Amino acid sequence: MTKKVIRKPDSLHEVFERKGGSAPTATHYCAGCGHGILHKLIGEAIDELGIQERSVMISPVGCAVFAYYYFDCGNVQVAHGRAPAVGTGISRAEDTPVVLLYQGDGDLASIGLNETIQAANRGEKMAVFFVNNTVYGMTGGQMAPTTLIGEVTVTCPGGRDPRYAGYPLHMCELLDNLQAPVFIERVSLADPKSIRKAKRAVKRALEIQRDGKGYAFVEVLSPCPTNLRQDAEGAERFLKEEMEREFPVKNFRDRSSETEPLIRSESDFSRESLDRIFQIKEDSVPDPVDDPEFREVRVKIAGFGGQGVLSMGLTLAQAACSEGRHTSWYPAYGPEQRGGTSSCGVVISGERVGSPAVDTPDVLVAFNQPSLDEFAGDVREGGIVLYDTATADFSKKENLRAIGVPALEIAKEHGTGRAANTAMLGVMMALGITGLDEESFRDAIRFTFSGKDKIIDINLKILEAGADWARKNLEGEF
C-alpha cells in the first residue's frame, strides 16, 4: 500500500540555506503572493519530467530575483529585462539545457519587451513564465505595463488613465502574432481549480523544453495582495472579476505535437576553421616573436571615410605581422559610407601589446584638415606628423616633426588618385620610422590585394613612387 507524503518537490530546497536569516524554511515573499504557488508548480513539473539536472532557472530583477534561494537546479541572475538574451546564450551554448525564464510584468513587458519579442520570434528553446500581477511588486506597487484601466497604484493614485498611460499590454496576444512560438497560454492562480489548470500549462511548457522543440510562453495571472492592499478574498475576486476579464484565460496555441525538435548546427570556432574562412596561411602570418630590443611604435592614421584610412592601417599591421612583430589594429569610424571621420591606431611592438588604443601616437598620418586639428595635439613630443598637402595645411611646431606629402598628387601621377594612402605608406617605408623592412611593406601590399593582380601592380608602383619622393625630398630628415 502506497503512502502519500506531502512535501516539497526535490527540485526545491528543503531548507533555504542561501536565503539565511532566522526563518530558513520560509520564502521572502509576502503572505498570499502568487510566486510561492508558481514556484511549487514549476518544481513539481521539473520532478515529474525528470529534468532537474538539465534545468537552468534565469531570474532577472524583480520580486523573484532571489529564485536561486529556492530552486535546486542551475541558477543565473541577470540584469533587468535581459533574461531572454542570457537564456539564448545558455540554450545555444549547451547541448541539452532546459532553460526557464521567470519574469515579472515590470521586467518582461517593459524594459525587457524587445528582448522578449526577439527571442520569441527566433523560436529560442526556452520556457518563459511571465508573472502578471498588474504592478511593479518589488519596488512598492507602481503602475506596470499590465496595470488595468482605472486601477489605483502608487504612481497613478487616480487610476490608470489611457489618455496618459495607454492601455494594458496583452503579451500573449502580442506574441501570438509571431510564427515561431510553439506554445502560448494564459493561466490564473485565482483558486484551486485555476491552479490545477496552471500546473498543466507549466508542465507542457517544460515538456517542450525537454524535447528541444522551441519557445514556450506561459502568462500567469497572480495576486499581489500587499501592494494592492487586498485580503485573500479580495485578491481572488480581483483576479476572477477584473484581471481575467481584461486578460482572458485561454490557450492561444499548442503546436508541440506537430513540431520537430529544433536542432541547430554546431558552431566551429577552431583556429583551423577561422584561418580557412579568412584565408590566413601559416606562412603569411607567423606567430610573433618577443624582441625587447625593438622600440614600440604607435601610429594613428586619420581622414575622411573613403580615403583608405582603415585599409592603410591594415596593410601596415600586416607588414608588421609578416616580420613576426606583435601588432594591433584598432579602427574608429562614423556611420557614413563616404565622407565621415575615420581613424585607426596601429601598434607595432617587440612584446605583447597591452592596449590597441593609440591615445598618444609616435606617428600621425592625416589625410585632411579636421584630422590634423583633432589629433596633432595628441602626438608625443618629438613625434612625427605626416599630412597630405592636397587636403591639409599644418603650421610646424617646435616639438613635432611635420612633413607635408603630396600623396594624392603622387598617386594620381602613377595610376589612381584612390591610392594616396599607399603613397603615404611608401613615404613611411623610405623613412624607416616603423622599424620594418621595405620588403615587408611590399609583401603586405601583395597580401592585402591578393587575387587582384592589376591592383597589386598599381599599388606596388605607387608605393615605390612614394618612397622615391621621400628619398629625393627628405634626405637627411631622419
From Swiss-Prot:
Molecular-function annotations in GO: oxidoreductase activity, acting on the aldehyde or oxo group of donors, iron-sulfur protein as acceptor; thiamine pyrophosphate binding
Top-level taxon in the UniProt lineage: Archaea
Keywords annotated in UniProt: Oxidoreductase
Species lineage: Archaea, Methanobacteriati, Methanobacteriota, Methanomada group, Methanobacteria
Annotated thermal dependence: Optimum temperature is 75 degrees Celsius.
SUPFAM superfamilies: Pyruvate-ferredoxin oxidoreductase, PFOR, domain III, Thiamin diphosphate-binding fold (THDP-binding)
GO BP terms in the entry: organic acid metabolic process; sulfur compound biosynthetic process
Protein name stated in the entry: Ketoisovalerate oxidoreductase subunit VorA
Keyword Oxidoreductase: yes
EC number: 1.-.-.-
Organism from which the protein derives: Methanothermobacter marburgensis (strain ATCC BAA-927 / DSM 2133 / JCM 14651 / NBRC 100331 / OCM 82 / Marburg) (Methanobacterium thermoautotrophicum)
Encoding gene, per UniProt annotation: vorA
Record note on quaternary structure: Heterotrimer of the VorA, VorB and VorC subunits.
Record field: pH dependence: Optimum pH is 9.7.
One Pfam family in the UniProt entry: TPP_enzyme_C
Keyword GTP-binding: no
